[in-house]
Amino acid sequence: MEDELLNFNYTDSGLPVIIKVIGVGGGGGNAVKNMYHGKVRDVSFLLCNTDVQALDRSEVPDRLVLGREVTNGLGAGSRPEVARRAAEASEADIRKILDDGHTRMVFVTAGMGGGTGTGAAPVIGRIARELNILTVGIVTIPFVFEGKRKILQALEGVEEMRKNVDALLVVNNERLRIIYKDLKLDNAFAKADETLTNAANGIAEMIMKEGTINLDFADVHTTLKDGGIAIISTGYGEGPDRMEQAINEALTSPLLNNNDIFKARRVLFNIYQGTEDPLGTDELSAINELTAKIETGFDTIWGYTTDPELGKKVKITILASGFDLDTTRESIRIGDNLGNVINDPISSREIETQNERDNDLINRYYRPDELEKVKVVDFKPIILNLDELDNDELIMALEEKPAYSRTGVLLSRIDNIRMRIAESAGRLKKDVVRSEESERPAFESERSSSPTTISFN
């Protein structure tokens, strides 16, 4: 498989494509596949992965193997640090792909919580940003049932993404599970891909669709450049009060991750009307109310476009950035749902501090009521003693899967191995004691029969 990207495509109008969507890892690759076969137009696509087989299975033509010499093309094994090294090893290739003279905006999309997406996406974001390309991250974070360990790994990846992109949109899979309660598991992941697609498409069409009051790349650049945490939300309306319906739907979407649009530093919105029933002047009052609320010293840009596919409906897409991180946190702590104390050699204060940091990070993106509905397993570290460290069978069992994905069967096998090691070590120590006692002089054996004895049981 070729590791190089072909020349960028051109739009139907003959202009070079300035927007590139990069899918990183398995989750990002699935999202880009969905976009490639879906409605996202006038953009080009690139897949990046440490897993050669995953790339070979994709129909997206432009693909890059990350760090072949680091992973041998076999994937990162759910280890972000391996994926980070792989992406850094391919930095020259990534720069060559992006520094083509055309690309002015890059979407880096990934699922946070695994290996390649979590570790490599921030590296790709950094490279794009260093090339002065407007860089937007669009990532998912796990369902609660995937466990605390994966959630924390995902949110650490989110924090790294925040440092390395201009703006970051976070899609909470758990929020999707609550909104679409009757979805099967496969459909739930597909819904996450669809949400990523809609986010990228919403921004792309603001740039590419010509409007009566036109938005362009410069407007999106102004809104997202160094914007930090961002959101995009779309609402539809039909019939009486359709404009109010659309605005209300956009402003109250659960996918806003609890962010209040009116607390954003920058807001851009675009209004779309159909050709069958264009907006009347009397409907502008709802728009006036919206702009009155957000025009309080913040940068606000808006546009107005006709979309024949809407028929009699109207649509509004709101893009906002520059949220203070404090506004993304919940006022109620998670507490023992995720913060149980673990027994290990670390001091209790260090454990408490780490739990506080972990809970604070989780509180930025998950609501307490979401976490209460699904029991979250608190994965405790396995502290090995010297006998266990010398046991190859135990080490191989521990290396089969990361802690958050070990099933009851594997955990039982690990426990059984540790019990055998302990029993064997106990027998060995007893044999040593008996041997030493048999070699002692009689008077020393008598002296050892005093009540003060040492037990190896």
UniProtKB/Swiss-Prot annotation:
Has the keyword Glycoprotein been applied to this entry?
Answer: no
Single biological process term from Gene Ontology: FtsZ-dependent cytokinesis
One Pfam family this sequence matches: Tubulin
Concerning InterPro entries, the annotation shows: Cell_div_FtsZ, Cell_div_FtsZ_CS, FtsZ/CetZ, FtsZ_C, Tub_FtsZ_C, Tubulin/FtsZ_2-layer-sand-dom, Tubulin/FtsZ_GTPase_sf, Tubulin_FtsZ_GTPase
Q: Where is the composition biased (Basic and acidic residues)?
A: 429-447
SMART domains named among the record's database cross-references:
Tubulin, Tubulin_C
Instruction: Cite the binding residues for GTP.
Output: G26, G27, G28, G29, N30, G115, T116, G117, E146, K150, D193
Q: One GO cellular component from the entry?
A: cell division site
Give the matching HAMAP family.
FtsZ
The protein here is known as Cell division protein FtsZ
